[in-house]
UniProtKB/Swiss-Prot annotation:
UniProt protein name: Trigger factor
Similarity section: Belongs to the FKBP-type PPIase family. Tig subfamily.
Composition bias, Low complexity: 438-449
GO biological process terms on file: 'de novo' cotranslational protein folding; cell division; chaperone-mediated protein folding; protein transport; protein unfolding
UniProt function note: Involved in protein export. Acts as a chaperone by maintaining the newly synthesized protein in an open conformation. Functions as a peptidyl-prolyl cis-trans isomerase.
Disulfide bonds: none
Region (Disordered): 428-449
Chief subcellular location: cytoplasm
Reaction equations catalysed: [protein]-peptidylproline (omega=180) = [protein]-peptidylproline (omega=0)
Keyword list, A-Z: Cell cycle, Cell division, Chaperone, Cytoplasm, Isomerase, Rotamase
NCBIfam families for the chain: tig
Taxonomic source organism: Acidothermus cellulolyticus (strain ATCC 43068 / DSM 8971 / 11B)
Pfam families linked to this entry: FKBP_C, Trigger_C, Trigger_N
Annotated GO MF terms: peptidyl-prolyl cis-trans isomerase activity; protein folding chaperone; ribosome binding
Length: 449
């Protein structure tokens, strides 16, 4: 076999492969055996029909076609191995010559991972925000915790922000009650802005038994129109928050004193912020590398992924009785802008994958069994399924190699992060130990092939 590689672009190559007919003989012989298993000829057992009989019965051309279908993947794979390129898509094959006794010539165009010259990670400095926990941070957490233990006490006064009221409400458009436009006996926090626009202002100042009407601008299918709403207050209840003392600490936690609870909250906030700092370091390291490197992406893969995500959006919108443009309009985004954002996201995701795959290849990183197990557990947890179910899903969908590649990228990012210099905004060195994040959360993956 002879093969040549032509570089069409930094992300696409063209193979030209020539195979002599003598090299095809094992493939032709195997094709005869396959065909012999499929044909039934009186006097011969299945699989035992001689080649001359097959030639007369169904024609040698059928055998040669089978041999061709088997030979192309085999010799294409050899050509890829010899060229030592990382293919990332299915090849576009064109047979330019194949005749009985003359051998085979074909071309294969395929997308490849671009060559990336990585900088020495030890020359890179990443700056992150420092981890600090103030008394105000602890106070805010304590206040939120106390709020969860608050009780509601009926009061005989006008409603004000923060009160909980029991309400009946009807919303009409052009005199007709809207679908789902009736609320009966609902508990609502005044000032929460949870139901319809204008409700909070209408409720303030009302006492139990009083009603009010107000204009309610609509969203969704009725965006741009204004309905008329009527609300009646049945009851007003005031939220009573417990005092922050040792008794509250014993009620709300495992601690005996408020100071012990405060110390625990401070430590928990610090732990969370160290994880956030680690995530920030990963993101800023990636962005630093992306900014310093020119990493081209294959347009065919980008276009295919953009189309796939557009179809996902279409199905999501359709399930809600809308089209994609209408759904995006609710979010204040045009279809054109959304497509531009999706394309930019896909291109960035591919560049990150190429970058990390290059690290994996250069450093010959491999996954240990425990690392793969951790990855599967983390991914399964995020998806809300058991690790066994997630692993079985990967096997059923033949996506185990994609999962392994994704886990390796996470390991590559950790490898880089351990070798760069990380400092906070004051210039102090940062030790990221203890703030690690799952490799599964590094970057979303784009299916390349």
């Amino acid at each position: 076999m002879k093969s040549a590689v032509e570089t069409l672009s930094p992300t696409r190559v063209k193979f030209t492969v020539e195979v002599g007919f003598d090299e095809l003989q094992p493939t032709v012989a195997a094709a005869y055996r396959k065909v012999a298993e499929q044909v039934r000829v009186p006097g011969f057992r299945p699989g035992k029909v001689p080649p001359p009989i097959i030639d007369r019965r169904i024609g040698r051309g059928v055998v040669l076609e089978q041999a061709l279908n088997d030979a192309i993947p085999q010799f294409y794979g050899q050509a890829v191995d010899e060229a030592a390129v990382a293919v990332i898509s299915q090849p576009e094959i064109e047979v330019t010559n194949f005749a009985d006794g003359e051998g085979l010539t074909f071309t294969a165009e395929v997308d490849v991972r671009p060559t990336i010259e990585l900088p020495d990670p030890e020359s890179i400095t990443v700056t992150v925000d420092p981890v600090t926990v103030s008394d105000a941070d602890v106070d805010a957490e304590l206040a939120a915790l106390a709020d969860r233990f608050a009780t509601l006490k009926p009061v005989d006064r006008p409603a004000r922000r923060g009160d909980f009221v029991t309400i009946d409400m009807t919303v009409r458009l052009d005199g007709e009650v809207l679908e789902d436009g009736t609320v009966t006996g609902a508990s609502y926090e005044v000032g929460s802005a949870q139901l319809v626009e204008g409700l909070d202002e209408a409720l303030e100042g009302l006492t139990a038994g009083q009603s009010a009407e107000f204009d309610a601008p609509l969203a969704g299918p009725y965006a741009g129109r204004t309905a008329r709403a009527e609300v009646t207050v049945r009851a007003v209840r005031e939220k009573q928050v417990p005092a922050l003392d040792d008794a509250f600490a014993q009620q709300a936690s495992e601690f005996d004193t408020l100071e012990e609870l405060r110390a625990h909250i401070r430590e928990r906030i610090g732990r969370t912020r160290r994880i956030q700092q680690h995530v920030q370091a990963r993101e800023r390291l990636l962005q630093t590398l992306l900014d310093s490197l020119d990493i081209p992406v294959p347009e065919r893969i980008v276009d295919a992924e953009v189309r796939s995500r557009a179809e996902q959006l279409r199905r999501y919108a359709e399930a809600r009785g809308m089209d994609a443009e209408g759904l995006l309009a609710q979010q204040g985004e045009s279809l054109h802008d959304h497509e531009a954002h999706v394309r930019a996201d896909v291109e960035r995701e591919l560049r990150v994958q190429f970058l990390l795959d290059t690290v994996v290849a250069r450093e010959q990183l491999q996954l240990q069994e425990a690392e793969l197990t951790d990855y599967l557990i983390q991914r399964a947890t995020r998806l809300g399924v058991s690790p066994d179910d997630y692993a079985n899903q990967l096997v059923r969908t033949n996506t185990v190699p994609l999962a392994v590649a994704d886990a390796l990228r996470g390991k590559a990012l950790t490898y880089l992060l351990q070798r760069v210099r990380v400092v906070d905004t004051t210039g102090a060195p940062v030790n990221l130990e203890g703030g690690s994040t799952p490799a599964a959360e590094a970057e979303p993956a784009v299916s390349e092939a």
